[in-house]
């Protein structure tokens, strides 16, 4: 269930209090693997049974309406997941695993044919990716990957299936090989701020930074962009990110969820269940802990106790210049009304009445002022709930945005310096310090 708070400055709540027993929002989609054992184990130990898969699907229905898998063949999971997902009310995004061997593609293709023949492949299938990070792993070239995808797409079209088909890979592959963008039906990118060594407070912001250019490309090409893998680990140690904790996983999800919801972003959380078999298979400890659920299908407590509230989008207009406070590439500027979707995002902010933060939609960073003097710098910085430089209060009677920590100072613009955004001593009836908070739809 989603909770909405239609107030002017609605709070986004991140509470780990133990007062709830389930995640109160639904994810767009979740990645799933029916594996439970390492590569070398016999199928009885390596693969979940039909009843175990069905149990998983019922658990996932509580947090999403879509599930995404990576292979038709591995653990025979397509044949098990498709009926189990339908029973649970879940749509399925299928995956075909690719390697440097075209013979393996033919095996997956043969399984695809049998799924169509049996009727398991029906309108409940909403997407199909051919390959997952195969180019990134340097097993095949981009052109080979496109060839594989075209082969599968041509086949399903010949069978009367219009399912959109794509290639899933890390975002840099899409940047390095633009021909992939033209070839796919929609863009499917994997992006993990976690592996890039950023502080969790900037995890969602880093994700936005990394995908911004491909979002622009997708809009220009009139194609959807799906974030096919995104997530954060709750345990283990990574040299770049440090110690992973349940609290940090919950923090990243909460921040990212708000970002995705505000932009109607399609994404698949990585991953559904913790998977100790990945460590047995030779992976790092952190790789076992990306799940929402434990391996026994119980929801992890950091998700179970997480309550996410609704944040209303707002625009901030200066009365003196009649321009809008805007953020681009971590910098502030004042802009006029625009029909460009990217500029509209830059002009949109979220007020958090609990933390007193003002967070940008386009960058997921907070309005920050660290120089308490006239002309002091105001910028955006990674949001930290207890950071005094990020505390603001809006005085509706005067239209002033007052700094809650640096008493006597207000958000100000200087027309003589190109409407520079700055901190300045609060003064009465100053149009450069008068701000109107409005719904972006009313700009």
What are these regions (language model features)?
Residues 1-22:
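Fungal secretory targeting signals
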Residues 27-111, 115:
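N-terminal carbohydrate-binding/catalytic regions of secreted carbohydrate-active enzymes
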Residues 28-31, 35, 40-45, 238-246, ...:
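Aromatic-rich peripheral "rim/lid" segments of glycoside hydrolase catalytic domains that contact
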Residues 79-163:
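Substrate-binding cleft of extracellular glycoside hydrolase catalytic domains
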Residues 88, 94, 126, 132, ...:
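Aromatic- and acid-rich polysaccharide-binding/catalytic face
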Residues 156-175, 222-230, 266-277:
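Aromatic-lined carbohydrate-recognition surfaces of secreted/lumenal glycan-active proteins
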Residues 192-196, 221-249, 273-275:
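Active-site clefts of carbohydrate-active enzymes
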Residues 310-443:
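Lectin-like carbohydrate-binding module/patch detector with strong preference for beta-trefoil
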């Amino acid at each position: 269930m989603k909770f909405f708070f239609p107030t002017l400055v609605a709070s986004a709540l991140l509470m780990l209090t133990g007062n709830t027993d389930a995640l109160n929002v639904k994810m767009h989609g979740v990645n799933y693997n029916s594996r439970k054992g390492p590569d070398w184990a016999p199928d009885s130990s390596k693969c979940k049974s039909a009843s175990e898969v069905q149990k998983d699907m019922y658990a996932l229905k509580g947090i999403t309406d879509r599930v995404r898998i990576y292979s038709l063949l591995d653990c025979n999971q397509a044949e098990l997941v498709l009926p189990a997902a339908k029973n649970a009310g879940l749509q399925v995004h299928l995956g075909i695993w690719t390697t440097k061997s075209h013979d393996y593609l033919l095996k997956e293709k043969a399984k695809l044919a049998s799924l169509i023949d049996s009727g398991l492949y029906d309108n409940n299938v909403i997407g199909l990716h051919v390959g997952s990070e195969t180019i990134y792993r340097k097993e095949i070239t981009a052109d080979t990957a496109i060839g594989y995808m075209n082969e599968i797409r041509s086949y399903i079209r010949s069978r009367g299936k219009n399912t959109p088909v794509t290639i899933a890979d890390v975002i840099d592959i899409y940047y390095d090989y633009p021909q992939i963008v033209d070839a796919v039906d929609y863009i499917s990118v994997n992006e993990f701020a976690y592996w890039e060594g950023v502080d969790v407070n900037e995890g969602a912001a880093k994700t936005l930074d990394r995908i911004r250019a491909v979002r622009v490309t997708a809009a220009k090409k009139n194609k959807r962009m799906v974030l096919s893998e995104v997530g954060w680990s709750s345990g283990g140690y990574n040299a770049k990110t440090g110690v992973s904790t349940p609290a940090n996983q919950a923090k990243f999800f909460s921040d990212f969820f708000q970002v995705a919801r505000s932009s109607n972003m399609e994404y698949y959380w990585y991953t559904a269940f913790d998977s100790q078999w990945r460590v047995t298979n030779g992976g790092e400890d952190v790789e076992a802990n990306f799940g929402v659920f434990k391996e026994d299908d119980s929801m992890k407590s950091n998700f179970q106790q997480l309550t996410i509230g609704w944040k209303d989008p707002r625009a901030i207009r200066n009365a003196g210049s009649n321009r809008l406070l805007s953020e681009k590439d971590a910098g502030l500027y004042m802009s006029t009304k625009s029909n460009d979707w990217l500029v509209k995002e830059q002009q949109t902010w979220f007020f958090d009445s609990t933390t007193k933060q003002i967070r940008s939609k386009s960058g997921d960073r907070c309005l920050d002022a660290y120089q308490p003097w006239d002309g002091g710098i105001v910028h955006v910085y990674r949001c930290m709930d207890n950071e005094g430089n990020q505390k603001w209060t809006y005085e509706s009677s005067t239209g002033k945005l007052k700094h809650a920590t640096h008493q006597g100072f207000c958000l100000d613009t200087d027309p003589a310096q190109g409407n520079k955004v700055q901190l300045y001593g609060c003064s009465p009836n100053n149009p450069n310090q008068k701000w109107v908070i409005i719904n972006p739809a009313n700009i």
